[in-house]
């Protein structure tokens, strides 16, 4: 067999060498054509069972069925949302309106004139827009290449999110305030989580809101998509965890020296669903849809929602949502919750909270259909053989008075043809009292105060002894005396570990129960010797919360320092055995060996500069708008290229990390009217910025700099043989370095012995020297990455 294969390869090689380049090209085209003709068949957008089912349930108003089905067969329009809490939101909105949207009006794609994008009437402050273009058209059409580049870069820098319109509804109905403690139970890939973070940071002048978001997902791999989404917003108030939402552990926090159960003010319960509301973008659903999907998910949806209301604080609000139109997944779940809550829950009337949104009220009567098409109107009609498949909670309550008191008409069902969206269901629940099975709330457990030094280590779950969790999620609660409701103190701890379990050093062997490999989250003690040089070098304010800094290594040099809010620190310290934490904290300082000789081994990180800047009182250089352009378009500009005032300020500082601050001038409204804070490095004769490529492009756009270059020009630009094009090499190296850095942070694998590379290696290599200023034709435009859209918008599909 081996000799035969070798002979075949040799014959193929000889025949290839004998063919001319023209013949080779002809054969290649023939192969491509054959592959195209043998491709996947086009999916027919029809499903008779689907139509029969929903026509029978009458969820669509009379006379609208044809419009409903026609809209389902049309591609879903693209929708974008501007990050509202960032100071640059107004500038981005202005840029979109005055530049990109106006240019779109004069373009035709495949003979179809593009309609001007319109704001979503129900989303506040015109921060969400939709167009009649699908995402596929935007991605593939050469005429829209410039607009696509803008979306990709701004999405990566966290200033824009591409998210389905109906997916934006649940966070709006949560009514998040900066002091709220929020749980997102099924968060990945994270577009709704990002929206919640925006609301949490409504006041940009407050670097640490009192509230926080714990974002959970059962899929470990999807958790990293969630981390990627959250990292774009650079918040110290987000924690990503990996648990089954139906048994997510109940957490403890310290309050005035006592330990108490953490109850959330807001919970988003966007459960896994059959997804038949997503037919417009997930066309596979057309051929795969059956009622069996809903019947199988119903029990899981009830368990997740039940666990959610258990952890909701009294007076708190939980939003339940699905991207399914099926009442078995929608009204049936809500009715089941209301029934067993015995008055502890009530459906909120939120019609006035989201004006401009068209929706249909929830239904009060429905039937259940099997995948074979058999209908059942009540549980008593179900054959015994189907009792494991069809449950009593899938039917509406039989008691008319009870059914009326539930107010199921307050549920909201969004139909695709009403506002050119996907299908969606949402309901808002208010918790008025403890759940009947949780009437006896545990009392506070007193314990001695813990010093900052002692309580300095919060390790990841694989480094501590496993705590067995009950499958229903109740075994993780504090031990409660059933007679008096008091929590039982832990008695199996040694005297040296009674103060707090997270004070104990981790065991030598890692726990293998959960199968993930996250590095520990180690809080740095306030008397750590690394703080004095940092405090002196940057003249940090005395109010700087040193105890909120953590690192991801137990031993060796601390390579990167991350910061979390005080409230998240509290959660981490008291729940390290219960939580499978994937990621938390924002990077604020990075180790740089060359910095030691200049007085501080840590440089500032651009990712966390807006969090750290309010505490910095030294090494700040105020720059002009022209200085910012120089910093972002040149790799390592000499001091002589900056304004005289900037040169004067820079000469007052020794070499090392600095802050570059631009303050807008209200007297010049035509210039950029939002502040910019950049991390930089003061060299011997130069200043360079530590800004990722996408952020550079963002700032340049806001300043009116053209950063677009067509793909064709990039592809036609071939390097000289044996020598790569300098510009392409720089972009490629920057992308590789950035990918390595992000991969390390997402995986949490950080070696304490590794140190930052030298200054010239850690700085982003996106030189952008070829960027052209607006109305300046002498300078060629910058080469921008043409990568496909890497962002993942969760449009409520699991």
From Swiss-Prot:
Lineage: Eukaryota, Metazoa, Chordata, Craniata, Vertebrata
EC assignment: 2.1.1.-, 2.1.1.203
Membrane-spanning residues: none
GO CC terms in record: extracellular exosome; mitochondrion; nucleolus; spindle
Disulfide bonding pattern of the chain: none
Reported function: RNA cytosine C(5)-methyltransferase that methylates cytosine to 5-methylcytosine (m5C) in various RNAs, such as tRNAs, mRNAs and some long non-coding RNAs (lncRNAs). Involved in various processes, such as epidermal stem cell differentiation, testis differentiation and maternal to zygotic transition during early development: acts by increasing protein synthesis; cytosine C(5)-methylation promoting tRNA stability and preventing mRNA decay.
Compositional bias per record (Basic and acidic residues), positions renumbered to this chain: 14-30, 723-747, 763-772
Catalytic reaction annotation: cytidine(48) in tRNA + S-adenosyl-L-methionine = 5-methylcytidine(48) in tRNA + S-adenosyl-L-homocysteine + H(+); cytidine(49) in tRNA + S-adenosyl-L-methionine = 5-methylcytidine(49) in tRNA + S-adenosyl-L-homocysteine + H(+); cytidine(50) in tRNA + S-adenosyl-L-methionine = 5-methylcytidine(50) in tRNA + S-adenosyl-L-homocysteine + H(+); cytidine(34) in tRNA precursor + S-adenosyl-L-methionine = 5-methylcytidine(34) in tRNA precursor + S-adenosyl-L-homocysteine + H(+)
Keyword list, A-Z: Cytoplasm, Cytoskeleton, Methyltransferase, Mitochondrion, Nucleus, Phosphoprotein, RNA-binding, S-adenosyl-L-methionine, Secreted, Transferase, tRNA processing, tRNA-binding
Compositional bias segments (type: Basic residues): 1-13
UniProt GO molecular function: mRNA (cytidine-5-)-methyltransferase activity; tRNA (cytidine-5-)-methyltransferase activity; tRNA binding
PANTHER family per record: NCL1 YEAST -RELATED NOL1/NOP2/FMU SUN DOMAIN-CONTAINING, RNA CYTOSINE-C(5)-METHYLTRANSFERASE NSUN2-RELATED
Organism for this UniProt entry: Xenopus tropicalis
Superkingdom of origin: Eukaryota
Alphabetical GO biological process terms: regulation of mRNA export from nucleus; regulation of stem cell differentiation; tRNA methylation; tRNA stabilization
Protein name: RNA cytosine-C(5)-methyltransferase NSUN2
Biased composition, class Acidic residues, residue ranges: 751-762
Active site positions, chain numbering: 323 (nucleophile)
Family statement drawn from the similarity comment of this UniProt entry: Belongs to the class I-like SAM-binding methyltransferase superfamily. RsmB/NOP family. TRM4 subfamily.
Region (Disordered): 1-30, 476-499, 723-798
């Amino acid at each position: 067999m081996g000799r035969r294969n070798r002979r075949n390869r040799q014959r193929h090689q000889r025949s290839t060498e004998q063919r001319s380049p023209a013949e080779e090209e002809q054969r290649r085209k023939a192969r491509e054509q054959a592959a195209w003709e043998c491709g996947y068949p086009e999916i027919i957008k029809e499903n008779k069972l689907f139509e029969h089912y929903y026509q029978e349930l009458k969820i669509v108003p009379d006379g609208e069925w044809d419009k409903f089905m026609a809209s389902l067969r049309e591609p879903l329009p693209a929708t974008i949302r501007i990050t509202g809490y960032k100071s640059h939101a107004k500038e981005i909105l202005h840029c979109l309106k005055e530049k990109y949207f106006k240019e779109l009006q004069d373009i035709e794609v495949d003979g179809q004139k593009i309609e001007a994008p319109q704001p979503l009437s129900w989303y506040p402050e015109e921060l969400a827009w939709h167009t009649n273009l699908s995402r596929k058209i935007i991605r593939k059409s050469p005429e829209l290449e410039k607009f696509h580049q803008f979306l990709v870069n701004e999405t990566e820098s966290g200033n824009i999110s591409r998210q389905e319109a109906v997916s934006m509804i649940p966070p709006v109905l949560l009514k998040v305030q900066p002091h709220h403690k929020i749980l997102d139970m099924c968060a990945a890939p994270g577009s709704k989580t990002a929206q919640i973070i925006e609301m949490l940071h409504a006041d940009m002048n407050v670097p640490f809101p009192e509230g926080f978001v714990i974002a959970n997902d059962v899929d470990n791999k999807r958790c990293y998509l969630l981390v990627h989404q959250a990292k774009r917003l650079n918040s110290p108030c987000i924690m990503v965890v990996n648990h089954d939402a139906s048994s997510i552990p109940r957490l403890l926090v310290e309050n005035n020296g006592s330990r108490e159960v953490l109850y959330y003010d807001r919970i988003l319960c966007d459960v896994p669903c059959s997804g038949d509301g997503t037919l417009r973008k997930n066309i596979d659903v057309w051929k795969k849809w059956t009622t069996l999907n809903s019947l199988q998910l119903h029990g899981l949806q009830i368990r997740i929602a039940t666990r959610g209301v258990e952890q909701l604080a009294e007076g708190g609000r939980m939003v339940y949502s699905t991207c399914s139109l099926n009442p078995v997944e929608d009204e049936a779940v809500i009715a089941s919750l209301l029934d067993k809550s015995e008055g502890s829950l009530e459906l909120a009337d939120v019609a006035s909270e989201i004006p401009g949104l068209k929706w249909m009220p929830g239904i009060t009567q429905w039937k259940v259909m099997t995948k074979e098409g058999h209908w059942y109107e009540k549980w008593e009609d179900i054959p015994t053989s189907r009792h494991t498949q069809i449950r009593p909670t899938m039917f509406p309550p039989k008691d008319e008075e009870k059914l009326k008191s539930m107010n199921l008409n307050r549920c909201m069902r969004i139909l695709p043809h009403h506002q050119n969206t996907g299908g969606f269901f949402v309901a808002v629940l208010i918790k008025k009292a403890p759940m009947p099975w949780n009437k006896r709330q545990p009392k506070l457990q007193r314990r001695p105060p813990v010093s900052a030094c002692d309580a300095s280590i919060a390790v990841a779950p694989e480094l501590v002894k496993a705590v067995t969790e009950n499958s229903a999620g109740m075994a993780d609660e504090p031990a409660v005396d059933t007679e008096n409701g008091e929590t039982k103190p832990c008695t199996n701890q040694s005297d040296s570990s009674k103060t707090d379990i997270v004070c104990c050093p981790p065991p030598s062997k890692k726990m293998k129960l959960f199968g993930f490999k996250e590095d520990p989250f180690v809080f740095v003690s306030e008397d750590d010797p690394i703080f004095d040089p940092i405090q002196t070098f940057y003249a940090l304010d005395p109010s700087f919360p040193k105890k909120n800094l953590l690192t991801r290594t137990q031993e060796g040099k601390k390579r990167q320092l991350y910061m979390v809010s005080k409230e998240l620190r509290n959660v981490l310290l008291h729940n390290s055995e219960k939580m499978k934490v994937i990621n938390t904290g924002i990077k604020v300082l990075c180790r740089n060996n060359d910095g030691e000789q200049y007085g501080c081994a840590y440089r500032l990180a651009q990712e966390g500069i807006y969090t750290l800047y309010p505490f910095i009182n030294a090494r700040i250089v105020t720059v002009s708008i022209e200085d910012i352009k120089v910093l972002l378009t040149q790799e390592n500009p000499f001091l002589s290229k900056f304004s005289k005032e900037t040169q004067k300020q820079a000469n007052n500082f020794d070499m090392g990390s600095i802050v570059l601050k631009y303050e807008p001038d209200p007297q010049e409204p035509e210039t950029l009217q939002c502040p910019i804070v950049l991390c930089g490095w003061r060299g011997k004769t130069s200043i360079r910025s530590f800004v990722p490529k996408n952020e550079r492009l963002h700032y340049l756009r806001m300043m009116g700099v053209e950063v677009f270059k067509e793909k064709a020009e990039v592809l036609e630009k071939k390097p000289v043989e044996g020598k790569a094009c300098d510009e392409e090499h720089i972009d490629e190296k920057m992308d590789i370095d950035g990918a390595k850095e992000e991969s390390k942070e997402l995986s949490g694998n950080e070696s304490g012995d590794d140190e930052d590379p030298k200054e010239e290696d850690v700085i982003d290599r996106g030189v952008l020297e070829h960027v052209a200023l607006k109305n300046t034709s002498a300078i060629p435009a910058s080469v921008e990455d043409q990568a496909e859209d890497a962002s993942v918008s969760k449009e409520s599909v699991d």
